[in-house]
């Protein structure tokens, strides 16, 4: 059956080159490193491996095409942070190591831009930062506490993260009900599909092999079983993110959650003069049910949000990506935020699956004794962290000393998710509670105790 890959996102539809799949695996083979997953994590790992040791035989195994998953569908936020936040790293290691991880994440945003330039990847990279609005009193208080805490505990300055008053925030994004906001400098907007497709081409040029249309069935020490043959490898890298649950024995490793997006038609200069985002800042507000957007290189708004239900037993179902009522709700949120967009044409509606570990803490690891390596669990914030993860994995695998190989997420192993039906009840219950918390905060102006309690339970 022919798959219409361009229908999977604005970014894939707009990709200027062909999306024809590379050849699948042609039978049993033997390599030095087998990387399972042709998204950011897998390709960054392969890219850095081949730069560190060009003699390595590196094989990337991808079920569909490079960028089919979240790497070709996300919001294009290359942001220097983890979903878990630095407090988690501070608790589990030390303040000093948490600061080092933050610094490495900030640098990874610039590293993505450097590699895009070096490899001539035209992905519309624009480091304009993030504007996160406060649109009720609870959001404003939460932001004020966050900025003060991060500057005090982790040494951030106004050059990294700063509060904006209402006028300053509206000058960046002319939204409704703005009380203030936070500006975070370490973010770039980009076209995610052009980045991941360009990475695939870079891996090809470096001598790596990418086998597409090849489904990995199981992974174990020294071996990957696929539907096109068995791969023997000294090192096996799991880089499957939201699709990890499809591997034998990994149904409870990461839970796949959906995020859905829409894109407007290209907007005229008069509309942009009213909206703002002059530096292509990415944007959001501080609600618990996350929204996120960017001004694309061709003048659209690409805008998304959470809220799609979790499928029982980690079910991945393409029909969830086209739930029209969820897309309609996302459009309502966009117009409520920016009323001047009422009536603009929506040209694309899509969605994708992201990977969530039980403790919301991404990890990178390599067991030299077994040759098993892994990275992921970014909870939807993987564009920049995947670069750091792939770079770190390559250094661990090749035995290269660097300041990255002992960062606090290296070697972390999240506990397994609960079995069904507990998992289904807990995740979908949490989604409902967070939506309720947002409504309560909007009405009362006070931070929701429901949300505070739920965050503690989830993490």
Language-model features, listed with the residues they occupy:
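Helical element adjacent to the flavin cofactor pocket in flavoenzyme catalytic cores
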Residues: 148-153, 176-234
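Dinucleotide-binding Rossmann-like beta1-alpha1 core, especially the glycine-rich loop
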Residues: 81-166
């Amino acid at each position: 059956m022919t798959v219409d890959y361009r229908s999977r996102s604005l970014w894939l539809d707009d990709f200027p080159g062909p999306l024809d799949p590379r050849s699948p695996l042609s039978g049993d083979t033997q390599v030095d490193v087998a990387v399972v997953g042709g998204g950011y994590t897998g390709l960054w790992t392969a890219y850095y491996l081949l730069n560190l040791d060009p003699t390595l035989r590196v094989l990337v195994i991808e079920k569909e095409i490079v960028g089919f998953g979240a790497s070709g569908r996300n919001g294009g936020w290359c942001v220097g942070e983890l979903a878990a936040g630095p407090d988690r790293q501070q608790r589990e290691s030390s303040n000093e190591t948490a600061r080092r991880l933050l610094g490495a994440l900030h640098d990874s945003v610039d590293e993505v831009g450097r590699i895009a330039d070096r490899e001539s990847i035209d992905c519309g990279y624009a480091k304009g930062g993030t504007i996160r609005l406060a649109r009720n009193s609870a959001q404003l208080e939460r932001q004020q506490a966050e900025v003060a805490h991060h500057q005090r505990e982790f040494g951030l300055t106004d050059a990294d993260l700063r509060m904006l008053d209402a006028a300053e925030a509206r000058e960046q994004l002319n939204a409704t009900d703005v009380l203030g906001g936070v500006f975070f400098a370490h973010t770039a907007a980009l076209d995610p599909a052009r980045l991941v497709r360009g990475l695939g081409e870079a891996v090809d040029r470096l001598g790596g092999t990418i086998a597409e249309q090849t489904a990995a069935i199981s992974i174990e020490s020294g071996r990957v079983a696929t539907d096109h043959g068995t791969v023997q490898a000294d090192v096996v890298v799991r880089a499957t993110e939201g699709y990890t649950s499809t591997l034998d024995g990994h149904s409870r490793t990461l839970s796949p959650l959906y995020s859905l997006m829409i894109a407007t038609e290209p907007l005229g200069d008069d509309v942009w003069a009213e909206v703002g985002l002059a530096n292509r800042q990415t944007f959001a507000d501080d609600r618990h049910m996350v929204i996120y957007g960017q001004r694309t290189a061709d003048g659209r708004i690409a805008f998304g949000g959470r809220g799609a239900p979790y499928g029982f037993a980690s079910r991945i179902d393409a029909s969830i990506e086209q739930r029209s009522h969820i897309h309609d709700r996302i459009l309502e949120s966009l117009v409520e935020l920016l009323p001047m967009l009422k009536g603009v044409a929506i040209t694309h509606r899509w969605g994708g699956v992201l990977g969530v570990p039980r403790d919301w803490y991404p990890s990178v690891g390599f067991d030299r004794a077994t040759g098993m390596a892994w990275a992921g669990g970014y909870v939807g914030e993987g564009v920049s962290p995947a670069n750091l993860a792939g770079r770190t994995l390559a250094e661990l695998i090749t035995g290269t000393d660097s300041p990255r190989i002992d960062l606090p997420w290296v070697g972390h192993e999240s506990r397994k998710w609960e079995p069904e039906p507990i998992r289904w009840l807990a995740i979908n219950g949490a989604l409902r509670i967070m939506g309720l918390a947002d409504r309560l905060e909007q009405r009362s102006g006070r931070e929701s105790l429901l949300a505070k309690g739920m965050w503690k339970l989830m993490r």
